Curated annotation (Swiss-Prot):
Involved in urease metallocenter assembly. Binds nickel. Probably functions as a nickel donor during metallocenter assembly. This is Urease accessory protein UreE. Gene3D superfamilies: Urease metallochaperone UreE, N-terminal domain. It comes from the Bacteria. It comes from Yersinia kristensenii. The gene is ureE. It is found in: Cytoplasm.
Length: 228
């Protein structure tokens, strides 16, 4: 096993390493978003090198990090991180709204995202939400809950990662693919009782199949079951 305790540089950010590795062969250490948040792990590179990562606890691997460099054979071990795409919700337009409207919208947005069990980080007047379902479903949730006036877009996770602190990156990307996914695509306003939070749900196990939930809820004056 080759022990990696330090990051030599980054081929995507450091001009010196970009020049040094211009004609080099890359032996990639491919990590998913959960593995990338760990300062200690053991994994094989694409060319079969047994790598033991043992970094300081505050250090998080980034896409393009150079972990080893064999100058004689011109082979570099480089990190490749496969991050999920991210939905970016722009809250800037709320600054022109009244304080009451701003508070109401932010509360309702937080409730809607939480109701989906979606992780989120708020920074620079934006909300970052890692994709756990198809973009069409996330788009539907935003529009069905009445947030179409808030600009939102879908970007690569690698674009967002540099904007985050280590703790924010762990919150946003660490293990997002392991969470159960609930997609609620109907507005509470559509319910005849107004306050009912029962919405058709799709439950994904991450293994390629999903199923609907049958469950009951209360409208305050009576309880009943719903079956889909």
């Amino acid at each position: 096993m080759i022990l990696i305790e330090h990051i030599l540089g980054n081929v995507k950010k450091d001009p010196i390493w970009q020049e040094k590795l211009k004609d080099a062969t890359f032996d990639l250490l491919v990590l998913d978003q959960r593995e990338a948040q760990k300062s200690r792990c053991r994994k094989l590179s694409t060319q079969g090198l047994d790598l033991g990562i043992s970094l300081d606890r505050h250090v998080v691997l980034a896409d393009g990090d150079v972990l080893a460099w064999d100058e004689k054979n011109r082979v570099a071990v480089v990190v490749q991180i496969n991050l999920r795409d991210v939905m970016v919700i722009d809250l800037s337009e709320l600054k022109s709204r009244s304080p009451d409207e701003l508070i109401k919208t932010c509360f309702e947005l937080g409730h809607a995202l939480g109701n989906q069990h979606w992780k989120a980080v708020t920074k620079h007047n934006e909300v970052y939400v890692p994709l756990t379902v198809a973009t069409t479903m996330m788009d539907s949730v935003m529009r069905t809950h009445g947030f179409q006036h808030l600009p939102f877009r879908f970007v690569k996770g690698a674009e967002i990662l540099p904007l985050l602190s280590n703790s924010e990156a762990r919150l946003l990307f660490g293990g997002a693919e392991d969470t159960d996914t609930h997609v609620h695509v109907a507005s509470p306003l559509d319910e005849p009782h107004g306050s009912g939070l029962h919405i058709h749900a799709i439950h994904s196990h991450g293994d390629g199949h999903s199923h609907d939930h049958d469950h009951s809820h209360s409208h305050g004056d009576h309880d009943h079951d719903h079956k889909h």
